[in-house]
């Protein structure tokens, strides 16, 4: 298939003598920084023989360019001052040097390069042969000899824009970790279909902070919104060839610039500063509503792909410094990300770039934290992972970054890439063990039992409910990294939605154009009897109860819960578990809710209110099983169906799938009793003695909506819990 890329004519590169720049008189700061006389520029290109900063003016009919020679400074940095430059000026770099791809050197002055420190961009890259530093064929494939391409990329590449350095007054919610509930969302998909928002704001930064959006977030009870990447991005050529785009945005073009296409059309038309203002305005309005803003960030790789990919920025500036290469074959990239390249975090400039970018988003934009995609790559020193990597030491000791929320996706695709629980404080980790355990207990094991098979025992379930101390309770600090270092989740952007987890046995990714080969096969899902949509009332009821079991387990487990946007309303992606290229109805939240969806939303909101209002669900430390500060009951007691302390042998018995967990409110809050019945039939239980005060039935997952009952039971009372259910009781202190 021939790639659907631009073939419009572009000019050949013409070398000419650049104008001289003036030496910088003040401190050197990477990027472009305005002052009263003009602009200071500094860029890293350690293997270059010459570097030019190029100021570009474009119109529909003509592109003009002024080139200025920079001076080599210390540590491979090139600097210069150019008078008369003002905010709004487009610019890039041309880098001269050795062309030797076999040695990892890809200098080609025909390619105008985006400043890695640009704070704004104008024009998205246009997929065109001129974007490649090497000669490519009609399908954008390289020739065997990797000759340098002499076409000028100025008309098809992204340009940086000089902007004013602005101070931003930021009033943060500063939500404590124990109160934090994270809501993972895409800027576009969150509001593209949301009624009550003006059409021009839907699917934009402004729409994400519209009062209608904020009302939903506040009513639901989340405290932080974690946006999928909003760094400027570029779609991969193979997606462009299919007429698709990288909707999720895990293909970064620049680490400082917000993605322009997520701004309102009016902001895009007004220019880069208006886009920046819209992003800052979004953060400010969310802060005013008490909602923190977290960003999913992708520092592990860039959009330049493998060695046959385009040359947009880093590759042309200093390919052998920015990217990991095979030491024996320097022309070969090492890829631990599955995206063609990996940034080399053994290099101080890569660490500095990452830290500078993070600080910029905190101090200038106002964000409250980050989730690091494929974070193991950020902690690699060669093939090994160092949990005290210099990047993490720097973040932990940085006066700015140590004060925001830092979350790891604790794996990558390289050797030894699974590292959940092994990152340092004060960071938190996505807890995939929690996800897998809860899915197994509530979804796949009941399916196996109903079909004559056998489930697992309860040990791992209890460990996850109690905060995963096996993963987060160790280390040099007493108490380990702490109970809120576990980011508990059932679903995320990649994988099935909560609805699809209980409606599909198999992924259905045909719409992605990869013959259903993409996306994981390890879904731990169960369709409850019919694949996909059904009118069978029994199956639909069972699916909804399983979802309520999962939500309750997520919300009341110790740790920090994360909910995927739309799950609270039973969002479906029609079985697509890898909708990264689906910028459409498959990915956007459908806000036209039926009664069952409204009921689920009410239930999730109610459960989150219970978590917020009861300190019992938000302990300070890991449980000990002992009496804390003279309390008359242990901080946590595991009980069997008779209300007696769980005997050891029952923990190992796969036929025992019923447990009670009594959590102390320490005499200040109500004690909470959770009864988990993992059997496909109802079971008789005896409630524990507790403090001797009555137990109030608060909620059961068999209920379609919260009931606000007055039902109470005396300690030791006999009752029956429904099949496959999660039941919650409260007992008030004396």
Each model region followed by its residue ranges:
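Beta-sheet entry/capping signal
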Residues: 42, 180-181, 223-226, 290-292, ...
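Glycine- and acidic
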Residues: 340-343, 372-377, 528-540, 585-592
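Conserved alpha/beta catalytic core and glycan-binding cleft of carbohydrate-active enzymes
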Residues: 366, 381, 387-565, 569-570, ...
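Short catalytic/ligand-binding loop motif for oxyanion handling, primarily in non-cytosolic enzymes
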Residues: 100-104, 191-193, 233-237, 301-304, ...
């Amino acid at each position: 298939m021939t790639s659907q890329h631009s073939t419009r004519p572009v000019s050949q590169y013409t070398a000419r003598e650049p104008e001289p720049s003036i030496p910088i008189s003040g401190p050197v700061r990477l990027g472009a920084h305005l002052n009263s006389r003009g602009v200071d520029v500094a860029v890293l290109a350690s293997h270059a023989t010459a570097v030019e900063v190029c100021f570009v003016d474009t119109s529909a009919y003509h592109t003009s360019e002024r080139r200025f020679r920079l001076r080599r400074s210390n540590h491979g940095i090139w600097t210069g001052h150019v008078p008369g430059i003002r905010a709004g000026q487009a610019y890039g770099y041309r880098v001269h040097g050795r062309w030797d791809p076999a040695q990892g050197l890809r200098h080609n002055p025909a390619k105008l390069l985006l400043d890695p420190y640009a704070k704004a961009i104008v024009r998205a890259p246009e997929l065109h042969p001129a974007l490649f530093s090497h000669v490519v064929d009609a399908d954008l494939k390289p020739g065997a000899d990797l000759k340098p391409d002499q076409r000028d990329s100025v008309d098809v590449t992204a340009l940086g824009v000089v902007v004013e350095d602005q101070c931003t007054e930021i009033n943060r919610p500063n939500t404590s970790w124990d109160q934090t509930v994270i809501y993972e969302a895409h800027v576009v998909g969150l509001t593209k279909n949301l009624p009550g928002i003006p059409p021009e704001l839907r699917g934009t930064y402004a729409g994400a902070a519209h009062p209608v959006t904020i009302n939903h977030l506040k009513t639901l009870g989340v405290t932080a919104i974690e946006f999928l990447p909003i760094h400027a991005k570029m779609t991969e050529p193979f997606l462009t060839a299919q007429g698709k785009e990288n909707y999720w945005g895990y293909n970064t073009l620049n680490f400082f610039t917000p993605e322009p296409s997520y701004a309102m059309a009016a902001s895009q038309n007004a220019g880069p500063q208006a886009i920046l203002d819209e992003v800052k305005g979004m953060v400010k309005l969310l802060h005013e509503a008490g909602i923190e803003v977290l960003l999913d960030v992708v520092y592990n790789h860039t959009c330049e792909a493998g060695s046959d990919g385009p040359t947009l920025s880093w590759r042309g500036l200093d390919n052998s410094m920015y990217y990991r290469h095979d030491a024996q074959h320097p022309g070969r990239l090492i890829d631990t990300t599955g995206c063609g390249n990996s940034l080399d975090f053994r290099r101080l400039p890569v660490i500095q770039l990452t830290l500078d970018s993070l600080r910029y988003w905190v101090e200038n934009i106002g964000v409250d934290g980050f989730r690091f995609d494929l974070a193991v790559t950020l902690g690699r020193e060669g093939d090994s992972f160092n949990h005290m990597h210099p990047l993490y030491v720097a973040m932990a000791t940085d006066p700015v970054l140590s004060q925001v929320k830092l979350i790891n996706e604790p794996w990558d695709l390289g050797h030894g890439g699974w590292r959940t629980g092994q990152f340092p404080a004060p960071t938190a980790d996505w807890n995939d063990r929690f996800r897998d355990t809860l899915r197994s207990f509530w979804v796949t094991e009941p399916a196996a039992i109903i079909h004559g098979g056998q489930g697992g025992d309860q040990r791992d379930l209890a460990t996850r409910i109690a905060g995963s101390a096996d993963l987060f309770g160790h280390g040099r600090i007493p108490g380990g990294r702490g109970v809120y270092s576990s980011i508990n989740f059932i679903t995320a952007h990649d994988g099935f939605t909560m609805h699809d987890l209980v409606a599909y046995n198999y992924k259905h990714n045909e719409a992605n154009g990869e013959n259903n080969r993409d996306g994981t096969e390890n879904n731990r899902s169960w369709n409850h009897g019919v694949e996909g949509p059904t009118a069978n009332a029994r199956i639909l009821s069972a699916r909804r109860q399983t979802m309520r079991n999962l939500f309750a387990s997520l919300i009341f487990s110790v740790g920090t819960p994360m909910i995927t946007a739309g799950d609270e309303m039973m969002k479906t992606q029609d079985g697509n578990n890898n909708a990264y290229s689906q910028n459409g109805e498959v990915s956007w939240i459908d806000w036209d809710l039926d009664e069952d969806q409204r009921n689920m939303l009410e239930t999730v909101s109610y459960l989150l209110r219970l978590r917020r209002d009861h300190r019992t669900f938000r302990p300070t430390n890991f449980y000990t099983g002992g009496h804390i500060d003279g309390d008359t009951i242990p901080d946590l007691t595991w009980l069997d169906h008779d209300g007696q302390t769980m005997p050891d042998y029952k923990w190992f018995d796969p036929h025992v799938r019923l447990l009670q967990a009594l959590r102390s409110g320490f005499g200040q809050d109500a004690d909470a009793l959770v009864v988990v019945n993992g059997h496909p039939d109802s079971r008789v239980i005896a409630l524990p003695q507790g403090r001797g005060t009555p137990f109030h039935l608060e909620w059961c997952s068999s209920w379609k909506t919260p009931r606000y009952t007055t039902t109470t039971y005396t300690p030791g009372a006999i009752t029956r819990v429904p099949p496959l259910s999660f039941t919650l009781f409260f007992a008030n202190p004396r």
